Amino acid sequence: MHLSPQEKDKLLIFSAALLAERRLDRGLKLNYPETIAFLSFQVLEGARDGKSVSQLMSEGTTWLTKSQVMEGIPEMVDEVQIEAVFPDGTKLVTIHNPIN
C-alpha cells in the first residue's frame, strides 16, 4: 500500500483517536496526545460528513469537558488547528478553548 505523508498522518490520528475513545468509554481521562487526536479526528470526520467550518468550530467546544481530561490539559490546549478536506477544498479549522 502506497500512502502519501498526509494519508499516513490521518491514519495515525485515527489510531490515536480510537484509543482515546476507548479510554473515554472506560472512564479514563485523556492525556495531551489523546486529547489532540480526539479533537482532530472529530474535525476530520465532521468535514467528511459535510459539516461546515463554522459548524465544526462551534461544535468543537462541546466534544470534551474538563472532567474527561487530565489535570492541566485544558490550560495546555487553548487552540486546536487542523486542515480538513471539505467538498469545496482543504480548509484550516481552528477551535479556540476546545475543553469546557
From Swiss-Prot:
Biological pathway: Nitrogen metabolism; urea degradation; CO(2) and NH(3) from urea (urease route): step 1/1
UniProt-listed Enzyme Commission number(s): 3.5.1.5
Primary location recorded for the protein, binned into one broad class: cytoplasm
CDD domains reported for this sequence: Urease_gamma
Catalysed reactions, semicolon-separated: urea + 2 H2O + H(+) = hydrogencarbonate + 2 NH4(+)
One term under GO cellular component: cytoplasm
InterPro entries reported for this sequence: Urease_gamma, Urease_gamma/gamma-beta_su, Urease_gamma_sf, Urease_subunit
Keyword field: Cytoplasm, Hydrolase
Keyword Transmembrane: no
GO BP annotations, alphabetical order: urea catabolic process
Any GO molecular function: nickel cation binding
Family statement drawn from the similarity comment of this UniProt entry: Belongs to the urease gamma subunit family.
HAMAP family in the cross-refs: Urease_gamma
Complex and partners: Heterotrimer of UreA (gamma), UreB (beta) and UreC (alpha) subunits. Three heterotrimers associate to form the active enzyme.
Protein name, as recorded: Urease subunit gamma
